[in-house]
Amino acid sequence: MERAIQGNDAREQAYGERWNGGPGGSTSPFQLPDESPSWTEWRLHNDETNSNQDNPLGFKESWGFGKVVFKRYLRYERTETSLHRVLGSWTGDSVNYAASRFLGFDQIGCTYSIRFRGVSVTISGGSRTLQHLSEMAIRSKQELLQLTPVKVESNVSRGRPEGVETFKEESE
């Protein structure tokens, strides 16, 4: 018979999952294990001097409930199959269940964060708005992961504001 994990036991289990990257436990909102690259693998795919040359293997995301934070690094190959897999890394139900282990009668802060290709999005709110927060988080995650490098790099980042056209001078 599975026992309910409450109080300090839940925090200790969450702390262990945060660092050991184990698959989603009874308190974790994540349903996939951590897939962090090794140091050597990370260095092969990331340029420390020029972030524009980065070729990340995946993305980082986290859920926080008060002082408890769950983090994951998930691999993402920018394919349709990979997108569907990582979009299922957590669900509204798994987030609600994990949050219920840490939420008492008082409202606490809840935060979702995702970082991919140098872009970071953080959404936060109170525990009473958790359902709305998880809906916003899944939309943000889907939009961020579906952006192509062309969309991320706008005309402004290339030094030419949008709407400005270049004209050749006619010589007489």
Curated annotation (Swiss-Prot):
Residues 1-38 are annotated as: Disordered. SUPFAM superfamilies: Tombusvirus P19 core protein, VP19. Keywords: Host-virus interaction, Inhibition of host innate immune response by virus, RNA-binding, Suppressor of RNA silencing, Viral immunoevasion. Residues 1-15 have a biased composition (Basic and acidic residues). It holds the Pfam family Tombus_P19. One of its GO terms (biological process) is symbiont-mediated suppression of host innate immune response. Gene3D superfamilies: RNA silencing suppressor P19 (3.30.390.180). GO terms for molecular function: RNA binding. Disulfide bonds: none annotated. Homodimer. Viral suppressor of RNA silencing which binds specifically to silencing RNAs (siRNAs). Acts as a molecular caliper to specifically select siRNAs based on the length of the duplex region of the RNA. Belongs to the tombusvirus protein p19 family. This is RNA silencing suppressor p19. It comes from Tomato bushy stunt virus (strain A23).
